[in-house]
């Protein structure tokens, strides 16, 4: 509707899904894109993260990597970088005209103003409630009173809205090198 191209739409959709389907995708995950131009040239964007710089190469006290939680993360989140690289490709080679901030604005609104919780989100949070209740960040947003939001209940994520606003204002690299990186 605003004259953007398919890559710009994919970035905006990905940002919105990070708000509305956090059980399937998110800013803290990996991201991948295959982009074909009008002449059939295909570009690949890989947002597969590397191991964090501060992760010890080997810790003899760790016998098993936990299934969930901060210690289970073995790579740096690559999704935001993939979105940023896709934006740059769109501008450089595909005539992209949308601003980075405009692509994140719908996701900011969803996170700030809320959206109806989905059946899929309810199923997975309910199914994993025991595990998720042990993660204070997840529990504070998605498990009020220890229970998953009901299907259709309005869910707001003000901290995620702030993160998305910061990305919109400062650019995708802030997630890795700026204010957001220092908070992570």
Predicted feature residues:
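Noncatalytic scaffold domains of N-terminal-nucleophile
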Residues: 1-2, 6-170, 175-177, 181-183
């Amino acid at each position: 509707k605003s004259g953007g191209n398919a890559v710009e739409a994919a970035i905006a959709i990905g940002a919105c899904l990070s708000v509305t389907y956090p059980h399937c995708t998110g800013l803290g995950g990996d991201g991948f894109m295959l982009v074909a131009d009008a002449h059939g040239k295909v570009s690949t964007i890989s947002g597969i993260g590397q191991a964090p710089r501060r992760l010890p190469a080997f810790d003899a006290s760790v016998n098993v990597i936990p299934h969930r939680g901060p210690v289970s993360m073995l790579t740096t989140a690559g999704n935001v970088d993939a979105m940023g690289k896709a934006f740059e490709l769109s501008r450089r080679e595909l005539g992209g005209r949308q601003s980075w901030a405009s692509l994140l604005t719908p996701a900011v609104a969803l996170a700030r103003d809320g959206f109806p919780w989905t059946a899929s989100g309810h199923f997975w949070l309910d199914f994993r409630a025991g595990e998720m209740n042990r993660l204070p960040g997840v529990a504070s947003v998605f498990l009020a009173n220890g229970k998953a939001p009901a299907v259709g209940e309005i869910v707001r994520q003000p901290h995620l809205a702030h993160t998305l606003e910061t990305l919109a204002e400062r650019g995708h690299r802030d997630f890795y090198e700026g204010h957001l990186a220092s908070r992570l």
